[in-house]
């Protein structure tokens, strides 16, 4: 891009030999020399000159932009990067340096502007030539710093970073005598422009036009945020001022244009709020329709109400609580209700607003106060306009109360043609939600105002409004700065070790560093949420709805299965459907408590219970309490089934999991009684055989056979409790885990997504023990691998609908009452005993501890003795071997006493060659003298 032809301003311009215009040069000039600020003396006068009105020459502005574009470093090659560098110089703004010349400076007259001003200093004393003898064109000058001297010339340009000017030709020699070397040590420098290309205030919006041809508004906003973060808080005000000048905030348009632009701004913001609402139906469209109608009816008052600060308390004279609750639910706003204090009743002015210290976003009606969230001030003001300012309008924004036809907002027709700025919003059913509902009725104001001929001034407001839509990009950069400041100390240590002196990373001109940091942040957040999920799969509904929560510590893994969860949510009843079907809506007295259950529904498919609580506005809103076991899709399925029985308009998600109960089994323990010993800060319940362990304010109940229940928590809280419980188990002195069995049973749980029943576990335990008996303990690893592969292939899979091992109400409801009552039991000692009365997770040692030798046949006793002998041989702790030894002694002694061959049980003889105990000779184990044992039969109700 070629620059414009130079003009004469006080002296001759540079004479170019060759017939063609030579591109204007931008020179490097220091602004700080040995910590002396050269710009402070002329700052006031230069600011006045910069703000002085001056006719804008578009060609001169293009020449300035072209000169700055050519002044970019060589390594900045792409056009967007070069334009960003030009934008960075414009954001730092204009600057001027005074100097004194003892004569005419040859070759640099186009950059020196004559002036006569006494400066206290510092200022530059410019020599004609440097003492080093350098005769390079444009680099032959030298300078010294003076004070209390008259300045004869001024150098004007744009403030820049020294790193941006490294490849620019310098006005002064780089030798130590010339003084140019001292300026390179400073952070800031000046890109000196020719004197006929100096900038003024009115030139900035036109420079933004040149920038906008390459960069979008969002890219400009991101770059401004990045520059502010890179240069620090000291330079941020200067950057913000020049950033606003680029969009023409200094221009004050005429009154009609300003009013139209402000109205368009409010309309655009209201339409953005409307498009951000999830539900588009009669409730939401009626709300925005009334607000927009009041905006066109009383523009000034509504605009002032929408700008009310959060400290101002808004008082209402009319209010409908049931309608307000419904609107808040559909808008998904968090509000809290309370009593209006005496300080809130003080009103100020005609708007009915009172001030109160310490309270924010308050909406008061008589003795009721509604508090909005800190970020919902705009919504608070919208409700104030809806209930207070628009109370004299009809239900749909008109004074004559027209009949509602559809979900749209019916408005009075306009007689004049709509202007392009008067756009419409389309509702969910296709009807138009007009943003120009009513014309202004004030006297002397016409329906159509003449447009301002200065259309470029309106475009500046449009640019500012468009920039507001990209505020989230700046928020990302601020979060990135915060994360970088938290880890700044570690980065400085790494930088010092690597030998670099500047710990600040190089400035990112293209934004690639910011994009990489944001992608890394998203990846880490994704992994942090799913670090405990099986195979890192995404859990639909979140971790709170996970059916299985698995954690591991070293080699110990535990899977916690959800038994049931209680979910609270709200739903809106369909009053239209009820009236159309002839159903009378229930009318409840105002004094009924909200904790009272109005009615309850129990379903078999899916198995759940839905309780509906009392509400004073039960015609519109109900609070639901869902008790269910299952995943998030099953929960949504249950809501669909519930909707078939009750006239529900909408369910308001997300739901809140207020209570979640889980059950877990610790597999592979050789002695399961150890887990309830060696525990501190525990207590035993008197009416239930359970040991309570208090962890993270949650009472974890441990039953026999290493089974536990964890109430109230889910998700990350449940994982934290499980990890602490595993840490306690791991540090117990007498705990020994058979990792072969532990791996098999953990795989079975994950494969079937259900806890292992009693019979299925006993089958695997005794099958593995018999294999060890047949093949020897030397083949233990091979046998464990064989059993694990069989479990992986589904040989030991089991059904979820078995009820012999569960008390879960929902499972019984799922399979039916007849099958649920047929729970298998065994008849022992003339008493019915549940099949899993020893515990669902009981192992071989736990079962053998409770076996009575005189009640079972001798052949089975022989098998149990041999199995216990195998377990004693492979046990890893002396404690477990001692417990097995005592169990064997009890079984053999009981069998000997029953046979009547000896009066006292003889001691067990354990040989050194084999760990399997020898059975006393007085006891026959071959079955020849088998005593008469009570008949064992199955009984069912």
Curated annotation (Swiss-Prot):
Keywords: Host nucleus. It is found in: Host nucleus. GO terms for cellular component: host cell nucleus. Residues 910-929 have a biased composition (Low complexity). Residues 479-508, 910-941 are annotated as: Disordered. Residues 488-500 have a biased composition (Acidic residues). Its main location: host cell. Belongs to the herpesviridae UL87 family. Functions concordantly with UL87 to initiate transcription from over half of all active viral promoters in late infection, without affecting host transcription. Acts on and binds to viral early-late and late kinetic-class promoters. This is Uncharacterized protein UL87. It comes from Human cytomegalovirus (strain Merlin). The gene is UL87.
């Amino acid at each position: 891009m070629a620059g414009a032809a130079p003009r004469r301003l006080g002296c001759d311009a540079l004479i170019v030999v060759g017939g063609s215009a030579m591109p204007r040069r931008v020179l490097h000039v220091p602004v700080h020399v040995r910590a002396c600020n050269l710009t402070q003396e002329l700052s006031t006068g230069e600011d006045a000159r910069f703000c002085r009105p001056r006719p804008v020459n578009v060609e001169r502005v293009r020449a300035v932009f072209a000169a700055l574009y050519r002044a970019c470093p060589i390594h900045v090659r792409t056009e967007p990067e070069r334009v960003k560098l030009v934008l960075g110089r414009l954001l730092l703004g204009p600057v001027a340096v005074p100097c004194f010349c003892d004569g005419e400076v040859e070759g640099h007259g186009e950059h020196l502007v004559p002036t006569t001003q006494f400066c206290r200093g510092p200022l530059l004393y410019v020599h004609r030539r440097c003492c080093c003898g350098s005769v390079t064109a444009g680099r032959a000058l030298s300078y010294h710093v003076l004070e209390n001297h008259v300045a004869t010339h001024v150098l004007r340009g744009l403030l820049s970073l020294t790193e941006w000017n490294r490849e620019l030709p310098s006005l002064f020699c780089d030798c130590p005598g010339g003084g140019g070397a001292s300026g390179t040590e400073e952070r800031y420098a000046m890109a000196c422009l020719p004197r006929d290309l100096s900038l003024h205030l009115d030139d900035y919006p036109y420079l933004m036009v040149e920038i906008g041809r390459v960069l979008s508004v969002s890219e400009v906003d991101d770059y401004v945020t990045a520059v502010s973060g890179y240069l620090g808080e000291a330079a941020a005000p200067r950057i913000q001022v020049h950033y606003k000048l680029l969009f023409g905030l200094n221009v004050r348009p005429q009154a009609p244009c300003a009013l139209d632009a402000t109205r368009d701004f409010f309309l655009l913001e209201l339409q953005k709020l409307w498009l951000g609402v999830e539900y588009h139906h009669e409730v939401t469209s009626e709300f925005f329709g009334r607000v927009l109608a009041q905006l066109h009816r009383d523009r000034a008052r509504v605009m002032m109400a929408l700008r009310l600060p959060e400290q101002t308390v808004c008082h209402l004279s009319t209010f409908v609580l049931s309608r307000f609750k419904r609107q808040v639910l559909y808008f998904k706003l968090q509000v809290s209700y309370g009593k209006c204090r005496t300080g809130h009743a003080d009103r100020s002015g005609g708007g009915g607003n009172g001030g109160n210290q310490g309270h924010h976003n308050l909406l008061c009606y008589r003795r009721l106060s509604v508090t909005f969230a800190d970020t919902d001030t705009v919504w608070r003001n919208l409700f104030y306009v809806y209930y207070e300012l628009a109370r004299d309008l009809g239900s749909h924004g008109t004074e004559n109360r027209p009949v509602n036809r559809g979900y749209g907002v019916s408005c009075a027709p306009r007689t004049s043609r709509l202007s392009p700025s008067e756009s419409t919003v389309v509702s969910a059913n296709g009807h138009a939600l007009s943003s120009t509902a009513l014309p202004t009725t004030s006297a002397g104001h016409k329906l159509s105002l003449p447009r301002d001929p200065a259309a470029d001034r309106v475009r500046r407001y449009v640019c500012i409004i468009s920039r507001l839509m990209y505020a989230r990009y700046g928020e990302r950069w601020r979060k990135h700065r915060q994360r970088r400041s938290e880890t700044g100390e570690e980065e400085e240590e790494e930088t010092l070790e690597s030998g670099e002196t500047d710990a600040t990373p190089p400035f990112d001109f293209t934004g690639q560093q910011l994009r990489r940091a944001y992608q890394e942040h998203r990846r880490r957040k994704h992994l942090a949420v799913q670090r405990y999920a099986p195979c890192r799969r995404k859990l639909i509904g979140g971790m709170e709805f996970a059916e299985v929560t698995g954690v591991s510590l070293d080699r110990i893994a535990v899977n916690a299965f959800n038994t049931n969860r209680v979910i609270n949510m709200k739903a809106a009843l369909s009053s239209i459907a009820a009236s159309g079907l002839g159903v009378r809506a229930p009318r409840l007295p105002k004094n009924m408590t909200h904790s009272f259950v109005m009615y309850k529904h129990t379903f078999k498919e899916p198995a759940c219970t839905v309780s509906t609580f009392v509400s004073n506005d039960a015609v519109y809103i109900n609070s639901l309490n869902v008790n269910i076991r299952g995943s998030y899709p099953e929960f949504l399925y249950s809501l669909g089934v519930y909707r078939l029985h009750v006239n529900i308009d909408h369910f308001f998600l997300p739901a809140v999991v207020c209570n979640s109960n889980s059950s877990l089994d610790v597999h592979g323990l050789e002695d399961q009684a150890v887990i309830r010993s060696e525990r501190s800060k525990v207590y035993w319940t008197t009416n239930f055989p359970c040991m309570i362990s208090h962890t993270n304010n949650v009472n974890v109940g441990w039953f026999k056979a290493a089974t536990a229940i964890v109430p109230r928590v889910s998700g990350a809280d449940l994982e934290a409790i499980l990890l602490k419980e595993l840490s306690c188990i791991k540090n117990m002195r007498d705990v020994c885990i058979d990792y072969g069995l532990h791996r098999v049973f953990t795989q079975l749980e994950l494969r079937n997504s259900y806890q292992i029943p009693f019979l299925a576990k006993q089958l695997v335990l005794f099958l593995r023990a018999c294999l060890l008996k047949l093949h020897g303990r030397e083949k233990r690893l091979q046998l464990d691998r064989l059993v694990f592969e069989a479990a992986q292939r589904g040989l030991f899979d089991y059904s979820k609908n078995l009820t012999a091992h569960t008390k879960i109400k929902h499972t019984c409801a799922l399979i039916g009452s007849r099958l649920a009552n047929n729970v298998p039991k065994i008849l022992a000692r003339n008493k019915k005993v549940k099949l899993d009365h020893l515990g669902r997770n009981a192992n071989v040692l736990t079962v053998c501890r409770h076996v009575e030798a005189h009640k079972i046949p001798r052949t089975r006793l022989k098998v149990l003795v041999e199995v216990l002998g195998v377990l004693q041989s492979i046990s890893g702790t002396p404690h477990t071997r001692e417990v097995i030894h005592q169990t064997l002694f009890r079984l053999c002694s009981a069998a000997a006493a029953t046979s009547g061959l000896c009066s006292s049980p003889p001691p067990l003889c354990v040989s050194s060659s084999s760990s399997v105990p020898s059975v006393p000779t007085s006891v026959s184990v071959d079955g020849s003298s088998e005593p008469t044992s009570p008949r064992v039969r199955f009984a069912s109700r």
